[in-house]
């Protein structure tokens, strides 16, 4: 596990909804997300469900990448946005964040527990046939996760390839600081996180056949635990 939360923020457009008072104001509005079925869609649907807003009460629009999402919000194509990395729009006062799964608290408030997103995964057959490869990959990730727990802005500037900053180092660092606490310290699946994921999927997608899923077989901490012991993460 690399991130313990979805790292998605849901924001209201200050251009089209400057007088926003509550989630009920989203009825009849257009909501942007990266892709249907993705984690940002899951965050958006969970937020709407908690507010008692039905899908037919809003218009969901797939926007793809972050640049497309920013353009859609700025031009008034969408009134709200469930997406990754709104740091630039936050700094400019273009959005008002009302749900934030970049933080542990925000994720627990929305889903009732931690909901890991980024992770290392593979078919069971591959894991069984290539355990050494799986262990090596896991070791690299856990080592990096440990480093990220103490890395300062200067460390990031020296390590991250320049093109990742897209010409704005300060914005990159601000974005990283917003998600920092969600980064796993050791790569282990948090307790009850798999149950939170299953419960959320069953609630949001009642048509999915997940009743017989064996959660204990859906993940393993075996490789991460070895790497944690090795690097004292």
List the predicted regions and their residue ranges:
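Secondary-structure end/capping motifs
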Residues: 127-209
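Short Gly/Pro-enriched turn/cap motifs at secondary-structure boundaries
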Residues: 2-3, 110-111, 189-190
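Short, glycine-/small- and polar/acidic-enriched structural segments
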Residues: 1-64, 72-75, 79-90, 94-101, ...
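Pocket-lining segment of extracytoplasmic ligand-binding domains
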Residues: 68, 74-163
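Short coil/loop linkers at secondary-structure junctions
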Residues: 21, 49, 54, 166-168, ...
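Short, mixed-charge aromatic SLiMs
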Residues: 35, 67-71, 166-169, 219-228
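Conserved C-terminal helix/tail region of periplasmic/extracytoplasmic solute-binding proteins
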Residues: 198-233
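Amphipathic, soluble alpha/beta structural segments
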Residues: 4-6, 150, 170-174, 222-233
